[in-house]
Amino acid sequence: MSLPASFDLTAEDAKLLLAANVHLGSKNVIVHNKPYVYKTRPDGVNVINIGKTWEKIVLAARTIAAIPNAADVAVCSSRTFGQRAVLKFAAHTGATPIAGRFTPGNFTNYITRSFKEPRLVIVTDPRTDAQAIKESSYVNIPVIALTDMDSPTDYVDIAIPCNNKGKHSIGLIWWLLAREVLRLRGIIPDRSTEWSVMPDLYFYRDPEEIEQNAAEDSKAEDAEEAPVADAEPDWSGETEDVDWAESGATPAAEEAAASNW
């Protein structure tokens, strides 16, 4: 698929994709994903063509931007590494997030409280989000999925080839997708304007690590705010015991008495 020159992959975005290991696929390859393989390393890891990854990101963003109501786009992630990215994507684009376990019947059982009728579904992994894809096929909802080389593509309309198991890779793909959607909607005025949101915001963070960092910061603030106690003068009234005979010094009182005579 050829893109207009304005949609070409920039050197900065290519560096981000490589730094996040988006190009490192699985060792197994499904026949439908073979066109996305650039080459196979000696250790068996299939290297994904990031040029085709970018083309699919642009295609997916154009599909999302074509939906008038942003809330009609449902974004799902049962995988832990993708839940933060899904929530951030929904916050920036107005989509409806489904982070965590997908409740069966969300798209098919209208009696449930969580029933939704989206016009487009985006999933992080076709394996972990298989229930969402299955129900989408029942009600004719198109599906966009982040697919690794061993991911099934049944009922997936747009597959974005990438490493969908690493936390940095997942976060970066969702960030690039959100940025491209905002560009197409005109919220980001042109392609020369940098998006103020950093990719790190979409990366998964361990809750224990967050608590540990917060505890360390609070300790540092307490140490800075603690007042430093000044050295108090010694008013105990005790004097040093001096042996005047050994030192050869004459007490001041004796000197005064001798001078009077």
From Swiss-Prot:
Q: Where is the composition biased (Acidic residues)?
A: 222-244
The compartments listed are:
Cytoplasm
Query: What segment(s) does the record annotate as region Disordered?
Result: 211-261
Residue ranges, compositional bias (Low complexity): 245-261
- Asked if the Swiss-Prot or TrEMBL record annotates the protein with the keyword Ribonucleoprotein, the reply is yes
GO MF entry, a single one: structural constituent of ribosome
The chain's coiled-coil residues are none
Gene Ontology biological process terms, A to Z:
ribosomal small subunit assembly; translation
Q: Does the keyword Metal-binding apply?
A: no
Which CDD domains does its entry note? RPS2
Looking at the Swiss-Prot or TrEMBL record, what is one Pfam family this protein matches? Ribosomal_S2
List the record's Gene Ontology CC terms alphabetically.
cytosolic small ribosomal subunit
Instruction: Print the keywords alphabetically.
Output: Acetylation, Cytoplasm, Ribonucleoprotein, Ribosomal protein
PANTHER family recorded: 40S RIBOSOMAL PROTEIN SA
Quaternary structure, per UniProt, is:
Component of the small ribosomal subunit. Mature ribosomes consist of a small (40S) and a large (60S) subunit. The 40S subunit contains about 33 different proteins and 1 molecule of RNA (18S). The 60S subunit contains about 49 different proteins and 3 molecules of RNA (25S, 5.8S and 5S). Interacts with RPS21.
Give the protein's biological function: Required for the assembly and/or stability of the 40S ribosomal subunit. Required for the processing of the 20S rRNA-precursor to mature 18S rRNA in a late step of the maturation of 40S ribosomal subunits.
Entry similarity comment: Belongs to the universal ribosomal protein uS2 family.
Q: Which named protein is this?
A: Small ribosomal subunit protein uS2
Q: Which organism is it from?
A: Meyerozyma guilliermondii (strain ATCC 6260 / CBS 566 / DSM 6381 / JCM 1539 / NBRC 10279 / NRRL Y-324) (Yeast)
Write the lineage as a comma-separated list. Eukaryota, Fungi, Dikarya, Ascomycota, Saccharomycotina
- Which gene carries the instructions for this protein? RPS0
